[in-house]
Structures are given as C-alpha cells and as structure tokens.
C-alpha cells in the first residue's frame, strides 16, 4: 500500500500554486487582498483514528480540534468549518451532531456547510475543512528555521499515549490522560501570540520526533532534540515513570496537538513552552540525552500506510 509520504510526493508534482507551500506545511495560505486565508483539511477513519465503540461526541471533538490545531500553527483566527460526514446509525449520528455543536461552541467557531454521503460499508470516515484568517504576516511555516534557533514545544507530551493505553486496557476513569487522547486542545491563543516572532512553527499531531524531522527537512537544516528536556506531566510520569525509554515514547507517539516552534536564542517566549533542542547546520534529525548522543528509533512517529 502507498505510504502517506509517497502519495504526498506524487501530489507535490502538480501542486504548484504558492498557496500550497509545496505541500510541506500544515495548511494552505491564500492571499486575499490585504488578508491571508488559511485553509486546512483533516480526516478521521474508524479503526484508524477511533474505535467503533468510541463516544461519538469525542470523535467530533477530536475532528474539530485536529483541524484547529493546524490553524494554530499558522497563528490564525478560526472563522468556520465545513463537514464531510458519512451517514450511519441514527443514534451515533445524533450523538456526533450534539458533540459537534458543543466543540464548535467551545471554540466559538461556525459550521458553514459541508456534505453528507451514505455508508455502504461497515466503517465510517469523516472529514473537516477549517478556515481561518492569519493574524500576522508573514504567516509562519515549517520552513523558516535558522541555525542557532532554540526549538520549543508547548505543554507536555505523552498524555495522549497514556490515555489511549488505559482506555484500550478497559479502564473507565483515567481523568486527564483520557481527555488528552479523546479531547485534545488546539493551541490557538498560543499560536497567535507566537506568530509575530517565531522563525518556524507546526503542530505535532504525528509525534515530536517525526515532525521535528519534517521541520528540519522543510528548512533544509538540522534539528537536535534533547530527550532529557522533553516535558512530561505528573500523570504521565506516575503511569510510565520518568526514564529515557518513556521520554522516547512520549516524543514519538503523537496525538499531542502541541506546537513545535523555533525562535531566536534569547527571545522572550510569551507562552507556556519548554526548550527541547536547537537548530544546527546540516540536515535531518539528531537526538541526545544531555551530553550523550542517542540513536534514532526505528519509528519517529505516526505515518499512514
């Protein structure tokens, strides 16, 4: 089966409009007069992104949050969404709609339209397009990192991983860890605050390591991540302990929806973020644990295939 990266490479051959940014970014950036319209689209598929017994309201929340996270990486103000919905069981559909109304209300985002289709199979697939207006020019991209920049990440990593494992094991009451997996928070305010001074920014839905490598590739430079600096929550440490292995897992699993960004050394960071590395000459991703080099793991993060 074609991998995600291989298929995107095929599309890249004819996605030549400047707004597409070479399909190397989180979203399209369309110049409209004096403004920039930010457009992104994400999909969720049953048994890939959510299980058949998942709460439909949680599915709706995550579908919206994952799209808004891409807008956050552009420092954008959301203005609305378009839903692509595969019809099925009536109770599930109604619960999804109620959850969608709730999450859109939480973020103050309008439902502008979309499309529905009947489901001839036994698995659902859902899509959402999110629209936003850039709050800063130039609009941040993955490709602007500069040698000497400090690499930061907002929030903490690994909670979604722990939440997924606990839910998968049948635990019903796992609190914040379950919420991190089922109902991630898009860092819209943080993205808007960071947009004026970052050199590069993206969200890390697929995992810190794989997305740091993507940023390095887009910027044609290298990024070194110090695993000793990976921010972990007390709940994650209580569940998995604080070790090199647990930090590696937190950095490579994904579903965190935090912001990864590069800023000049000495810049005053105006959001809750942790310095986790630096931009270096060369290319690709390298890892260390303090002063000790660390070999890259076989899998840096999540890729569809």
Residue ranges and their predicted role:
Residues 1-5, 9-10, 88-112, 117-126, ...:
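Glycine-/charge-enriched secondary-structure boundary and capping motifs
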Residues 1-55, 74, 83, 103-104, ...:
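Extreme N-terminal cap/leader segments of soluble proteins
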Residues 56-82, 95-106, 193, 207-215:
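Small-aliphatic-rich amphipathic alpha-helix that forms the alpha element of a beta-alpha
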